[in-house]
């Protein structure tokens, strides 16, 4: 399988929640199954709420680890969530909202990372980039 990591470059004015919703929408339209993970429980809750109102004319079906719906291809979970019957579903896209690199990337075809405008976050993104590149993932950058 050809694994890839996509780094989305965020502008200073881009907020994480809107950026994630745009990325989810893009992959939803491509019929991908998306797993979004963050240690930040409130970030997951904010993204969940925003997905309900993100666009007036469209709805992106999704669920969370708290209210799981097996018919949706998009799930938002807290990092460390351990329900294998849910996590072993074939989520081909993993959106990593944590500072740590996704080392078990073999579970997903596409790893999505966000590159935020501040220097500390850029440094973390560079480290992730090198990790994925050194592990032979096809790495690319996209603007949001």
Descriptions of predicted regions:
Residues 1-43:
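Long, hydrophobic N-terminal alpha-helical segment
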Residues 31, 71-72, 91, 107-109:
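Short, well-ordered alpha-helix to beta-strand connector turns
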Residues 37-39, 77-79, 95-98, 114:
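Short His-Asn-centered micro-motif
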Residues 42-46, 120-122:
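Short, charged/polar "capping" segments at the starts of alpha-helices
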Residues 48-88:
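Helix-adjacent hinge/juxtasegments
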Residues 82-107:
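SF2 helicase motor core recognition
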Residues 109-144:
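Glycine-rich, aromatic-bearing surface loops/beta-hairpins
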């Amino acid at each position: 399988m050809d694994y890839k990591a996509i780094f989305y470059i965020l502008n200073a004015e881009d907020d994480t929640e809107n950026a994630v919703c745009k990325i989810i929408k893009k992959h939803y339209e491509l019929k991908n199954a998306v797993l979004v993970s963050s240690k930040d429980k409130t970030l997951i809750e904010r993204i969940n709420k925003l997905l309900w109102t993100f666009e007036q004319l469209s709805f992106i079906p999704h669920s969370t680890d708290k209210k799981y719906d097996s018919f949706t291809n998009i799930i938002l979970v807290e990092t460390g969530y351990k329900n294998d019957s849910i996590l072993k579903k074939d989520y081909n896209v993993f959106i990593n909202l944590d500072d740590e690199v996704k080392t078990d990337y073999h579970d997903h075809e596409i790893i999505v990372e966000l590159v935020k405008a501040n220097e500390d976050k850029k440094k973390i993104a560079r480290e992730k980039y090198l990790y994925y590149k050194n592990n032979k993932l096809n790495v690319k950058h996209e603007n949001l």
